[in-house]
Every structure is written in structure tokens, then in C-alpha cells.
């Protein structure tokens, strides 16, 4: 939350080659008693879905990682997004909507458990547009007992370097506290 000191808590979706996540409460990453808190990638979103590397089916990883998007679209991310934004193929729109639908499903469910803003971060974050955020919000809030406002979804600015920066900030914080 270095870039958002006003936030006390957040749910972080790290949209990298492999999906990752974090739960932040009271300005600290929640580790959990067995150190696996925030492993959003293995939340089941479809019990009959694709086989995940963990051995289960339908994990969010199989729908919302950058690898899953590339596999679905049949092309690298760096080719996919320019073609998508230029509206070159309705097929690409379908792949992106499917991606966003699964992401919104996970966000909607997590919002019921953890009442906190959502941070979209990682490799795919720079590709998100205002239109994508609006789409997510519509799908998160449809039929939801508790809705999210637009200012509760934040898009990270560090892209694929987010994990490295986050790891470094741990030591920066320790140094600052020691001074």
C-alpha cells in the first residue's frame, strides 16, 4: 500500500503469467496460520473447468492468469491487446469478456468475505482501461447484496515488476523504522 497510504486494507489481484494475490489488513499482508492466505489463484470458480497445475479443476488460475488468456486467445498478450483495442476481431472481445467475467465473479465473492478495496496489479494491469473497470463493476454489482464503487477498484502502476517492488519495500520499511 506504499502508493496508497490512505488504504488500511485491500484485496490484491496479481495478474501475472501465473495468477497471485494478497489480502492486506491493517497495512499488513495477512499471511494466515499456514502461510497461504491470499492464494486467490486456487479459488474454484468452476468445478467442471480446466485442469489446474495444482491438480484441481476450475481454479481462477485457469481463467485469469496471463498464461490462461494467451492460451484462450491463441496469441501473446502483447499482440492480443492492441488487436482487442482496435476492435479487429469479435473473437478477441469474447475472450476478454470471458476473462473479465471470471475475474468479476471472484471479486464479487471476495467482496462478501473481505470488505476492502480491490487492487488490480501485475503484468496485465497496464492493459486495463476505464471501460474494463466499468465492465467489472457492472458484473460485480449485479445482484450483489453489497456493491463496490468505482473508487474501490484501483489499478496498479508497476506492471510485471510489482512483486519485486513489493519485496524490496519490505526492506525499505525495515530500514526506515531503524533510522
Across the structure, where does each feature detected by a protein language model lie?
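ATP-binding/phosphotransfer module of carbohydrate and carboxylate kinases, centering on a glycine-rich
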Residues: 2-4, 60-179
Amino acid at each position: 500500500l506504499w502508493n496508497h497510504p490512505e488504504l488500511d486494507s485491500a484485496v490484491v489481484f496479481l495478474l501475472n503469467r501465473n495468477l497471485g494475490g494478497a489480502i492486506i489488513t491493517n497495512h499488513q499482508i495477512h499471511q494466515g496460520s499456514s502461510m497461504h492466505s491470499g492464494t486467490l489463484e486456487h479459488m474454484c470458480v468452476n468445478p467442471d473447468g480446466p485442469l489446474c497445475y495444482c491438480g484441481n479443476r476450475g481454479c481462477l488460475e485457469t481463467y485469469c492468469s496471463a498464461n490462461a488468456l494467451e492460451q484462450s486467445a491463441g496469441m501473446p498478450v502483447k499482440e492480443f491487446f492492441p488487436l482487442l483495442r482496435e476492435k479487429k476481431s469479435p473473437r478477441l472481445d469474447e475472450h476478454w469478456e470471458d476473462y473479465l467475467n471470471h475475474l468479476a465473479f471472484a471479486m464479487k465473492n471476495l467482496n462478501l468475505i473481505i470488505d476492502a478495496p480491490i487492487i488490480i496489479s501485475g503484468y496485465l494491469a497496464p492493459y486495463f482501461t476505464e471501460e474494463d473497470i466499468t465492465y467489472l463493476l457492472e458484473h460485480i454489482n449485479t445482484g450483489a447484496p453489497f456493491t463496490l464503487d468505482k473508487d474501490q477498484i484501483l489499478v496498479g502502476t508497476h506492471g510485471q515488476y510489482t512483486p519485486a517492488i513489493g519485496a524490496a519495500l519490505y526492506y525499505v520499511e525495515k530500514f526506515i523504522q531503524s533510522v
